[in-house]
Amino acid sequence: MEAAAMAVTAATGALAPVLVKLAALLDDGECNLLEGSRSDAEFIRSELEAVHSLLTPNILGRMGDDDAACKDGLIAEVRELSYDLDDAVDDFLELNFEQRRSASPFGELKARVEERVSNRFSDWKLPAASLPPSSVHRRAGLPPPDAGLVGMHKRKEELIELLEQGSSDASRWRKRKPHVPLRIMGGEMQKIVFKIPMVDDKSRTKAMSLVASTVGVHSVAIAGDLRDEVVVVGDGIDSINLVSALRKKVGHAELLQVSQVKEDVKEITAMLAPVKSICEFHEVKTICILGLPGGGKTTIARVLYHALGTQFQCRVFASISPSSSPSPNLTETLADIFAQAQLGVTDTLSTPYGGSGTGRALQQHLIDNISAFLLNKKYLIVIDDIWHWEEWEVIRKSIPKNDLGGRIIMTTRLNSIAEKCHTDDNDVFVYEVGDLDNNDALSLSWGIATKSGAGNRIGTGEDNSCYDIVNMCYGMPLALIWLSSALVGEIEELGGAEVKKCRDLRHIEDGILDIPSLQPLAESLCLGYNHLPLYLRTLLLYCSAYHWSNRIERGRLVRRWIAEGFVSEEKEAEGYFGELINRGWITQHGDNNSYNYYEIHPVMLAFLRCKSKEYNFLTCLGLGSDTSTSASSPRLIRRLSLQGGYPVDCLSSMSMDVSHTCSLVVLGDVARPKGIPFYMFKRLRVLDLEDNKDIQDSHLQGICEQLSLRVRYLGLKGTRIRKLPQEMRKLKHLEILYVGSTRISELPQEIGELKHLRILDVRNTDITELPLQIRELQHLHTLDVRNTPISELPPQVGKLQNLKIMCVRSTGVRELPKEIGELNHLQTLDVRNTRVRELPWQAGQISQSLRVLAGDSGDGVRLPEGVCEALINGIPGATRAKCREVLSIAIIDRFGPPLVGIFKVPGSHMRIPKMIKDHFRVLSCLDIRLCHKLEDDDQKFLAEMPNLQTLVLRFEALPRQPITINGTGFQMLESFRVDSRLPRIAFHEDAMPNLKLLEFKFYAGPASNDAIGITNLKSLQKVVFRCSPWYKSDAPGISATIDVVKKEAEEHPNRPITLLINAGYKEISTESHGSSENIAGSSGIDTEPAQAQHDNLPAVRDDYKGKGILLDGRCPTCGRATKIEEETQDRVADIEIQTETTS
């Protein structure tokens, strides 16, 4: 809340940040403000601070219908004043010393404050927030009675089947399918797919003949596993009329797809294919219907309520009105549930008892009564529109679980509630209400138009405005109904000559809040909008810059939020983006295993544009925009989005004032974007030209010459630029530079002059190195060079003291400079898909904040804590330089990234190096490779290390005698890994008292039945065996060792002990597989791709080559085990040793 109070918002504008900026200006003794100007500034600051102190708790902290407050005349004036004051301060700061001495920057603003704020503020009261009554709420979400239930039959049948038969879908979540737009492409080849049940040759002949005789059809083919799909290729085909004709001829037809022939339709087909896990049918006692506002949640719930009602002893349908907290309407809802359950009356509200209890006591009384009444009954409970999880928790407590076949249906528009229901209760199935298919959507829209008598004036083919409505509505039933009704009204008003203007739908989109026939749709959308806190509304309104055909790039949007001043930190902005997904405003497509993309429903975007226009927050100009209205608007354009089809020449030819525009976003194929008059944008702070293929080097140079010095964000991603011009150095206040996916091959030296740069993103470029001048970017907190040919980072990155995120993913980098240990604020280091296997040990200094992403996993590797500071303070400066050669932090090995990085001694050694013993006794983990034995004094040193929790011992050669671990020392050790040809080790009584994990990595060797003694490891929980695929687990030495450990595990007092043995992913039970031969016979499936195997090979350290004995007695001749380890790829299967308890 505190951070949000200081941000730019749609309601209060730049009021909070500009007050901070004005205070800093007044406190700066070197700003050379004249006495009169200082007095003006102090007056403005005093008056606006009083307004801010009133608005902050009342607007920022509340939900509800704040439109009255935010559109109030005084607040609107303060909002515009804040933007102008922000510009005035920046204008003054750009002046030189002499100009400042004669400037009077705040005189006019002071007069405005006196006239329009001060004189009105004393009697001004904040308009009261209000929520619509429950009757309005319920009306908004339902279609009119005469609209028909087009497309609801299939949903009803699916849901009834779930309730009556259960589900075989192990995910318990039926996902909504991405919408496939219905496109009419005059003159272009189309591919149209129909589904037609053709039971015999006669029906097939009828269908094929009809399709073949249709105008525009070039070819017809039969497809589908059941040969029930007709694929049509042609141009100018009226698919809706063809579907109608097919239904008359053969009884049924469904439109599956309309696309251009040149498109690859495999991607769409793959997206639409349902993915299910086959399992046993399980009972579904509760269905959570999830969907967008206007998607038909309430309608289908009512259909189910009436269709199934006779099967239940009692039934309830209760709707919940939205509120800022769950408490106001909850008692009323509980009373409604009890009344309906008792009396079976759907619209009666009654109090179930005559007591005088209030508050929680009354709620609890209702819960107890409902639960007691329903306990022995078969019930159907429908709870419509859950807004708060706390509401559902209370209602759920009142509904008892029994075995009488009771069913619960709930609806919500919030993803977060559906996900929590799904996680908390195995009996819940989440059913996402999808869009109506294009055929049903066209039928619904056309039916409303023809019912009104306007069907003959709407047009046919590509002139049929119903096609545009279907594309805009994305199959949302409520939007289809009311927009089709509005279209009829517009046609009546405009007449046939204006019908092409209707086709653009721009005037209808812009009138969602004003056209009377669209009021029910607007009310439904307002419910969700008003439920958002102000900071989320601000971020959401900014999304109105997009056209409904644009996909949203998450990182791009998040960083523009930061540049606009809505949010200060990227992590915070990412969290807000997630909130908008959870609340259903932004839709995510894809999953964790595929490319994710995001979009906002077109109807929601139209609604947001209208809201944005009310606040003068952002202006969108695109195809069909009324340019004369935009030019004549009395309010200045603060933020501008130019969308596909808008002629940029209009900007210079009209009287549109963009001198106070702070943000310009250019989306899509804007005609001649290089012709945008950037010199007119005198106060521009955000410029996004991403994916404009018309922008090249010469254009960028001219743009930089024209740009305002105040530009904070410059987005050039996806343009055709090859280099950054020297003129960029003038952008002294640039904070975010986004040049990914361009053709640039180097960063100019002038990059070091951008002292305020916070984010530098050069991903997917041809850059091969970072310039030394990067050390000058002291404010940089994000450096992203992923997918570039960069092979080395300069030591100067250690000078970036404020760096928080560094991404070198999928580059040629093999080793990171030791200077990264100086990056005390680093939080995320992404080295996935690189040859980086180790970090300098100095990186442990930042272990408390750093998360390392390594290998091909998204799970972070934590660095060992609490030792590096002690090490650095205890090691003399002269010795410290040598430590890099004897110690590093391993973040990945042959088996993927560990959960916690391990201090590793590089190379092979005859003994533990003296430097380790002298200076690194306090380590919490250690990984070291010895030649063939562990000397007694070395074991004593390891046993006495006070903090040692993880130990990895690797042996080049098979030890001649078993390594004996006695009951002395290793008091803190929890994880012990032995890497040897065979695990020649024996644990004596009371050895390693806190050891929980024992892991063996072995290859081959002579068979031995010697005891290992794991029964002496009193805290042991798991034993892991990993063996090379070159030596299968039926090799004599390996199988004998496994048998020994299995036998000892069965005798362990902590049984069952879990054994993990590399054998693919097949789970092996000791009851059915009593010998090692059976274990060896298990599948050894290798699921890791060849590239991943190659990437996981250890990096070669050049400084160790050809040096004989390398460091402190390292052995250069022992390399067999190392070689085998480098080639090892294995998989693990779970074996749980279950033994019968004997008395």
UniProtKB/Swiss-Prot annotation:
SMART domains: LRR_TYP. The keyword NAD does not apply. LRR repeats lie at residues 681-706, 708-731, 732-754, 756-777, 778-800, 802-823, 824-848, 945-968, 979-1002, 1004-1027. It comes from the Eukaryota. SUPFAM superfamilies: P-loop containing nucleoside triphosphate hydrolases, RNI-like. Keywords: ATP-binding, Coiled coil, Leucine-rich repeat, Nucleotide-binding, Plant defense, Repeat. GO terms for biological process: defense response to bacterium; innate immune response-activating signaling pathway; plant-type hypersensitive response. One of its GO terms (molecular function) is ATP binding. Disease resistance (R) protein that specifically recognizes the AVR-Pik effector avirulence protein from M.oryzae. Resistance proteins guard the plant against pathogens that contain an appropriate avirulence protein via an indirect interaction with this avirulence protein. That triggers a defense system including the hypersensitive response, which restricts the pathogen growth. Contribution of Pik-2 is required to recognize the effector avirulence protein AVR-Pik. This is Disease resistance protein Pik-1. It comes from Oryza sativa subsp. japonica (Rice).
